């Protein structure tokens, strides 16, 4: 683990900066965020297991956080429908990616059975809760790697952001979302930094620290960690929307 973390000393993965200052207007966060997610489709066939159709990205996110927690508490693992909805949330802004991953999965019973089995096995090994301990988080990624080949949509070696998205929904208060645009927002611009474990682990610890700052709301529906992530998205500027962000990441899935 130490070797992984030390690798980032060679570049600015170890020099992340928080662009969210004390003047950030949190009262407009939802509005600004929603304006970046216009490709969201509440009637998507990949949301078949979501009982109350969400009206936007945020509503789906909060529904999934609740659904994942409820399923893990009741039966120890998340179901296929929840998994597919998470993939859709990650990929919906890029039609090619949803066709290449979500549509193929929805039309392939063998893939569905394989994922079902993997989710049960993974759920049996994942702890119900984790703390902000980087060694424990690294263990989660190692465990998810072992199941990666069976989890369609996560098996690409470059799909680190997607694997992080799954872990985020499993542990929304501890594992932050991670991708290229988040890294750019905090000043990391190395090519393929979003595929590097050392940058990931540095960012996780950075997000833990920064999300505890007093200016971030603590009593909203989303966790402070998620609110920090949303603020990074909108702070990236008007020209880099959430959809563009996901589009950049979605290119990972074209070779599945």
PLM feature segments, named:
Residues 86-93, 105, 147, 167-171, ...:
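Generic structural signal for hydrophobic core residues of well-folded globular domains
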């Amino acid at each position: 683990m130490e070797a992984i973390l030390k690798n980032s000393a060679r570049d600015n993965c170890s020099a992340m900066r928080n662009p969210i200052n004390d003047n950030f207007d949190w009262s407009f966060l939802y509005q600004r965020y929603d304006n970046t997610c216009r490709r969201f489709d509440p009637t998507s066939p990949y949301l078949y297991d979501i009982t109350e159709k969400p009206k936007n990205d945020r509503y789906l996110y909060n529904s999934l956080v609740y659904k994942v927690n409820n399923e893990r508490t009741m039966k120890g693992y998340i179901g296929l429908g929840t998994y597919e909805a998470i993939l859709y949330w990650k990929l919906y802004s890029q039609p090619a990616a949803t066709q290449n991953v979500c549509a193929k999965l929805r039309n392939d019973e063998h893939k569905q059975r394989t994922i079902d089995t993997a989710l049960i096995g993974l759920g049996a090994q994942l702890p119900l809760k984790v703390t902000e301990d980087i060694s424990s988080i690294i263990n989660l990624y190692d465990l998810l790697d072992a199941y990666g080949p069976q989890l369609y949509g996560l098996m690409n070696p470059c799909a680190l952001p997607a694997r992080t998205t799954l872990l985020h929904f499993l542990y929304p208060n501890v594992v932050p979302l991670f991708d290229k645009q988040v890294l750019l927002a905090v000043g990391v611009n190395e090519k393929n930094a979003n595929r590097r474990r050392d940058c990931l682990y540095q960012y996780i610890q950075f997000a833990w620290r920064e999300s505890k700052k007093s200016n971030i709301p603590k009593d909203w529906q989303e966790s402070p960690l998620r609110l920090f992530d949303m603020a990074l998205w909108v702070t990236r500027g008007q020209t880099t929307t959430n959809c563009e962000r996901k589009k950049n990441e979605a290119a990972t899935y074209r070779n599945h």
